[in-house]
Regions:
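Structured beta-strand-rich core segments of catalytic domains in phosphoester-bond hydrolases
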Residues: 60-107, 113-115, 155, 173-270, ...
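Active-site metal-binding loops of divalent metal-dependent hydrolases
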Residues: 115, 269, 308-309, 403
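Short aromatic-enriched loop/helix-cap "lid" or pocket-rim segments at secondary-structure transitions
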Residues: 121-126, 187-188, 209-214, 233, ...
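Short, acidic/polar
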Residues: 154-167
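Acidic/histidine-rich helix-loop elements
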Residues: 115-157, 206-209, 240-242, 270-280
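Acidic, histidine-bearing metal-coordination/catalytic regions of metal-dependent phosphoesterases
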Residues: 2-12, 18-145, 187, 193, ...
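Stable alpha-helical elements in mature extracytoplasmic
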Residues: 158, 182, 186, 281-284, ...
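Metal-dependent phosphoester-hydrolase catalytic domains
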Residues: 9, 44-100, 172, 182, ...
Length: 412
């Protein structure tokens, strides 16, 4: 048999597979749309433990109807450029490269970003939305080593810098945490770039202690790349069966080009290293993984779990035995990390690096996990140390104490 006839048979077989896959997915998605639409729970302010901004639109976005206008407003801030970042190529198998060459796979990008809530970083001179009576005094989130804090933490500037960081990479899927201005700022700002999204606020958010709005988690997607099938907001369950104040969010998306379905989940785990906190993180992440497994069964072609887990991948001697990340990697879903998982802070990969008082911490605590059918082809590397300020993050050149992390993925 000639090479040409073999290639023709291979391509014909591949075309048949694609047609069958398309028909199967469309029949599934019609049923899924009914199920997920019934599950979806809108975010309201009826819950007294949640406080959301009353304004429909941030006044600073008035008249801003395009990405170009948004960039103009960012430029008017007169701040230095954001720290440079580059994508780092991953090793891709020969089969993966061949599938891409033959058009049998589709690429998309995903970004994970803890925004650093306004309510957890505002200055002492700023009047909180709900007043100062009975609340803790704010003090730039304890970032006392940051130079020019009155500029770095000025929300009118920092919110635009956060959007600038997102727009310079334009991810197809975006997951965020510590978002306390979703409906009034983040979503309308990113809608100018063609995004839509869903949001889940925390109950009893720590931001309330300072007189600010509740923070929460969100999933956004570029409408030109993905169509939403449905979303669901849940809260972790306590030992007594009641709902906790900590949410997680699921969104089922259909890729417009290849028609594959992607189930995305995000959450923000409890902070601070300690064994009791790590035990709680492991217990709660197992709840989320089980929910993902249930939702993904016969419904999603691929799964992604992104978030700020507030824990390292490995043991911290004298502080905690790692359980949370091992629970993810050992679960039946078979998730993998898009990024290398460093064993020490001296490794070049990290997601947060900050100074508070005499304390300096450098950790990997933000993650992008994916199912085996997805193949990362590149990931967003941390900035060079020489490009960071003495106080590391945040700074005049970076708007959060967490780096955004991002990966380009091949989708089957």
């Amino acid at each position: 048999m000639s090479w040409g006839s073999s290639a023709a048979k291979f391509l014909a077989s591949a075309s048949t597979v694609l047609v069958v896959r398309w028909l199967r997915r469309h029949s599934q998605q019609r049923a899924l749309l009914r199920v997920w639409s019934a599950k979806r729970r809108p975010v309201t302010t009826v819950d007294a433990t949640i406080r959301l901004p009353k304004e429909d639109l941030d006044p600073d976005l008035a008249g801003c109807d395009s990405v170009a206008q948004l960039h103009e407003r960012i430029a008017k801030l007169g701040l230095p450029p954001l720290v440079p970042r580059e994508m780092h190529r991953c090793s891709v198998s020969l089969a993966g490269r061949a599938r891409k060459l033959l058009g049998l796979t589709t690429s998309f990008t995903v970004m994970q970003f803890n925004l650093l809530a306004e309510g957890l970083s505002s200055g002492p001179h700023v009047e909180p939305p709900f007043g100062r009576a009975g609340v803790k005094p704010s003090g730039y989130g304890g970032f006392d080593a940051v130079a020019r804090p009155e500029v770095v933490f000025d929300w009118s500037k920092r919110k635009l810098r956060l959007v600038e960081e997102i727009l310079r990479f334009l991810p197809d899927v975006l997951t965020v945490q510590e978002c306390d201005h979703f409906a009034d700022f983040l979503l309308p700002a990113l809608r100018t770039a063609g995004y839509d999204g869903v949001y889940a606020p925390k109950r009893h958010s720590p931001c309330l202690e300072f007189g600010y709005h509740s923070d929460g988690v969100a999933i956004l997607w570029k409408k030109s790349a993905f169509a939403p099938i449905g979303s669901e907001r849940r809260y972790f369950i306590e030992d007594d069966g009641s709902e906790s104040g900590r949410p997680y969010l699921l969104a089922l998306l259909r890729h417009r080009e290849c028609d594959s379905t992607l189930l995305v989940a995000t959450t923000h785990m409890k902070a601070k290293l300690s064994q009791p906190n790590e035990d709680l993180r492991a217990k709660q992440i197992t709840q989320l993984l089980d929910a993902l497994e249930e939702s993904a069964a016969d419904k999603a072609d691929a799964v992604m779990l992104c978030g700020d887990f507030n824990t390292d991948p490995y043991d911290e001697p004298g502080k905690q035995v790692a359980k949370c990340v091992p629970a993810v990697l050992g679960h039946r879903l078979g998730l993998r990390s898009a990024y290398p998982l460093p064993r020490s802070e001296h490794n070049g990969w990290w997601t947060t690096w900050k100074k508070r008082g005499a304390s300096e911490v450098k950790h990997t605590i933000d993650y992008i996990f994916h199912s085996s059918g997805l193949q990362p082809t590149s990931v967003l590397a941390p900035p060079a140390v020489d490009d960071l300020e003495e106080a590391r993050l945040p700074s005049i050149r970076y708007p959060s104490d967490h780096l955004s992390i991002a990966a380009e993925m091949q989708m089957p």
